[in-house]
Amino acid sequence: MLDVNVFDELRIGLATADDVRAWSHGEVKKPETINYRTLKPEKDGLFCEKIFGPTRDWECYCGKYKRVRFKGIICERCGVEVTRSKVRRERMGHIELAAPVTHIWYFKGVPSRLGYLLDLAPKDLEKVIYFAAYMITEVDDERRHTDLPSLQNEIDLERGEVAKRRDLDIEARAQRLEADLAELEAEGAKADARRKVRDSAEREMAQIRKRSDAELDRLERVWDRFKNLKVADLEGDELLYRELEQRYGSYFTGSMGAAAIQKRLETFDLDAEAEALRETIRSGKGQRKTRALKRLKVVNAFMTTTNSPLGMVLDCIPVIPPDLRPMVQLDGGRFATSDLNDLYRRVINRNNRLKRLLDLGAPEIIVNNEKRMLQEAVDALFDNGRRGRPVTGPGNRPLKSISDMLKGKQGRFRQNLLGKRVDYSGRSVIVVGPQLKLHQCGLPKQMALELFKPFVMKRLVDLNHAQNIKSAKRMVERARSVVWDVLEEVITEHPVLLNRAPTLHRLGIQAFEPQLVEGKAIHLHPLVCAAFNADFDGDQMAVHLPLSAEAQAEARILMLSSNNILKPSDGRPVTMPSQDMIIGLYHLTSDKDEALGAGRSFSSIAEAIMAFDAGGLDLNAVVKIRFTDLVPPTGFEAPEGWTEGESLLFETTLGRALFNEALPVDYPFVNGVVGKGELSVIVNDLAERYPKVEVAASLDALKEAGFSWATRSGVTIAISDVVTPSRKKEIVESYEKKAAKVQGQYEKGLITDEERRTELIDIWTQATNDVDAAMRENFPERNTVNRMVGSGARGNWMQVRQIAGMRGLVANPKGEIIPRPILSNYREGLSVVEYFIATHGARKGLADTALRTADSGYLTRRLVDVSQDVIIREEDCGTDRGLVTTIAEVGPDGVRRRSETVETGAYARTLATTVTSEDGTVLAEGGDDVGDVLISRLVEAGVDTIKVRSVLTCASRVGTCAKCYGRSLATGKLVDVGEAVGIIAAQSIGEPGTQLTMRTFHTGGVASADDITQGLPRVQELFEARTPKGEAPISEVAGRIAIDETDRTRRIVVTPDDGAEEIVYPITKRSRLLVNDGDHVAVGQQLIAGAVDPKKVLRILGPRAVQKHLVDEVQEVYRSQGVDIHDKHIEVIVRQMLRRVTVLDSGEANLLPGELAERGRFEDENRRVVSEGGTPASGRPELMGITKASLATDSWLSAASFQETTKVLTEAALSGRSDSLLGLKENVILGKLIPAGTGLPRYRNVRVEPTEEAKAELYPSFGYDEIDYLPLGTGSGEAIALEELDLGRGYEADYR
């Protein structure tokens, strides 16, 4: 087999017939598969052992040679080589075709490559290939030119002959008529009879004329056709062609079918064609030029590669190895077989029949029909259904051809190469494991034993519990008690990976140290549930076991859950205590007035705990406690004379003192009620300022405290805790009157339906808000529902409002708001009508969610594909470019504060330039990491904007550099070289995709074209760079605005400042203007509200503007849903969308006009041309949608496994494309290590040299007196048992 580690590039090309024969181990001549009685393969058939190898290891077909000792011998009786049966997976055969056939991919693909090469329309090509027309393949122009005069004379003579014959025939008939008439007259016949005779004679003469005219016409047509005959002409008229061939067959040759195409290709002059096409491109216009460009691309592909155009026509076809198209026996003695065998059988049958017909010398029409059927059989084998009706099997099911085996989710690429199943894995239901540490998980004993079986067996033998592996296996299967002890030992320090599907981001797989647990469920730490998006309502998780030392090291260092506290999308902690833990900590840290023991003082926490245990102190009572090592909270006013480090009597509650025990010793004392918000600030602070080990310990302590105090708090809900406000009735009644008044105005015709709707919606929204306010006032402070919502443990006020206040307004399935509210709440219960309108929205919500999930998954897949080769390739690209970002702004209240976009725009990046204050003090150096601390310092110093490095301005050729990317949000440190930031970006954008709403937004009113697309569809529209629906125009020039309005239409006219021709933008009457009549607009200014077309932004304002536009617009959608994603992730994707340039004029560069060139290659070519003094190429930057950009990648393997597999492979094979295996996907397909992280080439050949000290320790210097001669024996000369020496352990002979 091929070793994947010995090559760095993979090329695909066109195979010629000789290549196919060279790969083959023999010709398949018969359509038989296996003998139904003996079940052995038939000789020369599709499963023949002579061709493909033996079906049993080391055994030939006839049984003469059995056993491995005959390895490599070819049996002289049956001709089968004695070898392993697995060669049947790799040995190929071939079928020698009796007539050539074309390859359907090259003839039928869009565009038809064969058609482009030969300059034929696909339908004409089809006529030739399927025997409906003849094609002229050769014309002897010289000889024809020489002989033309004599041939002209011949044809003239023949014409004369025909005319002469006609005249003689007519004359003879006329004479006969006269004789007949004379005879009739003599007989005295009536005039009627004479007229009949005359008419009959006239008819006959007309027929003679007609016949001779047809003859002359035919001669004329044949002669004209012959005079103008040239190569590649088609002739669909069989009779005309026959005559041509009969008369002038020596001057030309023509034929039908693939043979005609093959002849054309043999004599095709690529160089001359390329030159002619270049000339057409230079001088041509419009359609001709475009077609010439497309044709040149195909011609060029053959010129620049070793591919021969003849590869598109096949003389023999390969037969793939039989184990890849197996035939298996089912229970009932019937056979199930791969569809390919049926398709191959049809080809062989037709081929054999054609051979027989040719041998018999059958008439041409029969032979041609058989050839056509052979062509169709080969088409069906390669790509069934591409032309005409697909070949069907039993039950009218189309058979799966070779193309279908590659395509789609079930095809070879995605099913077997990118989605392999993994050994050493298991899955089970998860339950919560609150007793675990953050880095642990509970693994069921049986599952652990099965997973670690080989390790346990080896250890059993090492410890002499078992004699050999076989007996160790028996022990494990019988689950002896010693096995469990060994299992405990084996699993220590051996991490396992847990994965929950769907794995939407990198935190969907994490490593844990296993702890053995009883039962069959996996125990999961409650804090990692958020990362896995797991809950315990029956979710299942998979366990994988990293085997090699490297894999274990990676799992421990990179994937251990305690090292994955931060979320890669925004760099903030993901392991947040939630629900029960929050209510517990809220209960612990709240204070109660008048509580038991309030106002007392204690000498230490221990004393306060003692008082609490004795029942003399309430947990929430405000007391004074003396602390010895208190770090005071920020803003604490210290008593006079106190210095830090001394003991201090501090006013707090016992609960808060206990809460602070869970935090690191030097963390400032938290002296306040801790709800969800406060807790998130604390955890964020811990993650930013403390090492991971301490953060994990603190989180575990918070979890313990949270659960413990939640249990002791006894928080419950009864129906009596849901209190409906007493004022609700009067509030509703007052608004009912207002609503009735509006309805009355509408019925009198004073207001329109639209106005009525809007007013009613306003009235009832206000009513709902009033009821909400009354309800909140009505809740007692220590009411449990109030505490749950107030602490952020569960639910929100909107949900409480629906239970205790009123449901309010709801929407119908179209998304319009129904102007009649639901006045009841769930505590009171809904009326039938109310219930009915409420179900609308609920049902739509469920349908939406289902659709969203699939859409979001597909978006993630496209994002991963476009960005998978963005890897950090170098430390610093050395650029000084960057993006200017705002870090502080003045709010409406006049106070300067941090800008809202700091989190996603400036945080976790690298400074591009040095920042100085107004007085010239250096506040931060270029290259510094921008963290929370630095941002706060800069804002305080009065800095408003800073310039930061960005992926968009990175100068790296491949991938991007560490400095431009900045901090890795998942680790909080500068990103490492080798990090696959493209995939992390795709996951960060795709993972929250499911949360984005599907609906297009309606503000009441009827649906209309200018509804703003929002949510997921908007994100897709942006990343696919589509022109948005209801596009808003942007001004192409700077100038003055005039708004021109008529009854029906409205348009904006811009008069440019430079006096050029004015530009008109027609817009709808409904659109909202962003400019007024007479305003001055700048270039690129948006004229009406709505979404602008990114392609226009690129054309008018340039690449930097479109980058900013795309990043801002995508962020807009995510922010509106409350999802935080860092800008850098979106920038990585946008960078990939702008990677290519369309070549406008190739100059002297080695580029084709109109081709999409990679920006780096385009610049390199131009540099080369300019250095040689030539004319460089000109191009314009191209914005490609993510699907198009994925397919335009330089890696054909990656593109083929993404979409349109056959199209990509056709194109790649024709151009002889090489895949340099730089991305991740290509390497996964080939089974190589991915070039990210430690798989980067720079780490491949690392040698670790021991230091001198290490060498000295390893080889101690001996004196003679120190040598101990006791390697075998005890020095006393007494013999020792061989078992005590570790010789041949595990290989003891079993002499029983």
UniProtKB/Swiss-Prot annotation:
Keywords noted in UniProt: DNA-directed RNA polymerase, Magnesium, Metal-binding, Nucleotidyltransferase, Transcription, Transferase, Zinc
GO CC terms in record: DNA-directed RNA polymerase complex
One of the protein's GO biological processes: DNA-templated transcription
Pfam families assigned: RNA_pol_Rpb1_1, RNA_pol_Rpb1_2, RNA_pol_Rpb1_3, RNA_pol_Rpb1_4, RNA_pol_Rpb1_5
Domain of life from the UniProt record: Bacteria
Cofactor remark: Binds 1 Mg(2+) ion per subunit. Binds 2 Zn(2+) ions per subunit.
Binding residues annotated for Mg(2+), in chain numbering: D535, D537, D539
Enzyme class: transferase
Ligase found in the keyword field: no
Cofactor(s) the protein requires to work: Mg(2+); Zn(2+)
Binding site for Zn(2+) 1: C60, C62, C75, C78
Alphabetized InterPro entries for the sequence: DNA-dir_RpoC_beta_prime, DNA-dir_RpoC_beta_prime_bact, RNA_pol_asu, RNA_pol_N, RNA_pol_Rpb1_1, RNA_pol_Rpb1_3, RNA_pol_Rpb1_3_sf, RNA_pol_Rpb1_4
Subunit comment: The RNAP catalytic core consists of 2 alpha, 1 beta, 1 beta' and 1 omega subunit. When a sigma factor is associated with the core the holoenzyme is formed, which can initiate transcription.
Function: DNA-dependent RNA polymerase catalyzes the transcription of DNA into RNA using the four ribonucleoside triphosphates as substrates.
Protein name per Swiss-Prot or TrEMBL: DNA-directed RNA polymerase subunit beta'
